[in-house]
């Protein structure tokens, strides 16, 4: 096999950049929704929040507390959907709030709990696409009072139930055909909506992907370690990584590699320094990229006991709820085809609601945001 002439790194960057410009935006992308319903003895009506995220940016939020309800679009590109679209979405998400209230009561019955405590229902669902628009993965998870309740497995055909109460829900969902409805949505309208939202966003703002960053620790002989600061999956390619000690840049002591294409339209880079063992916390890595709202400062963090994946998700969702209650923003799926199929979506929504509401208290346990999605029917029924 003949070896060709090596391609310069700068040329690889130019080729990758030109390829990325033909896409909606380089890298993988996600559309995620979160629902939260909270009941407390001190409030007459449960607090209900629905939030939608495109990648890591919130674009829509619904907040219902008592008799008041607010619906906020928080990204300029969302307005391209038109007033009729969002009026319909407001109606849907308002209806979902009632389903959550009913499910909070149903869960009290399932677990034989009193009305005097505080209880929370959460749902998170969404989908992700890769560089070329193919579905990467989809998911749906439900939780009650913190722990997992039921979660859709990776095959999108079966559920994992956490306890006997969740087993009842799983059985009724399977009998009602709900599993197939969710899989169809996640593989179709969710992905289609994600791609359309990305295209709308591209029309109103320059495409940037902020770097995913972390610091790794590599022991060396004679009491030294190498600290390597990584920046991954960022776009465009221009980025600056520096190491500092006590606020002073270590220009001469930093090993810096050339920015490299990652193969999916994004880029990667790292910078490393050799430091004395035990002095790692004195060194900071600084990352500058136009996709970041402000420069990042990182240190090497000693490893801690890792949590199981779903526990991590629960912790993240819990943190998002607190942020939502305190500052009006919560954290991180769905969307719909281009074209005039709004009526079809509304019909599908009504059909699924009727199909799944087997019990008056049957619909929606969740923190899976549906705000702003005509393609998604009602919130997933937690119990039925």
Swiss-Prot record:
- Give start-end of the signal peptide: 1-26
Do the record's keywords include ATP-binding?
no
Cytoplasm is among the record's keywords: no
One GO CC term of this entry? Answer: lumenal side of endoplasmic reticulum membrane
Alpha-2: where is this region?
117-208
Where is the segment annotated Alpha-1? 27-116
Compartment list: Membrane
Which residues lie toward the Cytoplasmic compartment? 335-384
Q: In which tissues is it expressed?
A: TL antigens are only expressed on thymocytes, activated T-lymphocytes and on some thymic leukemias.
Task: State the annotated membrane topology for this chain.
Answer: Single-pass type I membrane protein
Annotated Ig-like C1-type domain residues: 211-299
GO BP term (any one)? antigen processing and presentation of peptide antigen via MHC class I
Subcellular location, principal: membrane
| Segments for region (Alpha-3) | 209-300
Sum up the protein's function in the record's words: Involved in the presentation of foreign antigens to the immune system.
Q: Could you identify this protein by its name? A: H-2 class I histocompatibility antigen, TLA(B) alpha chain
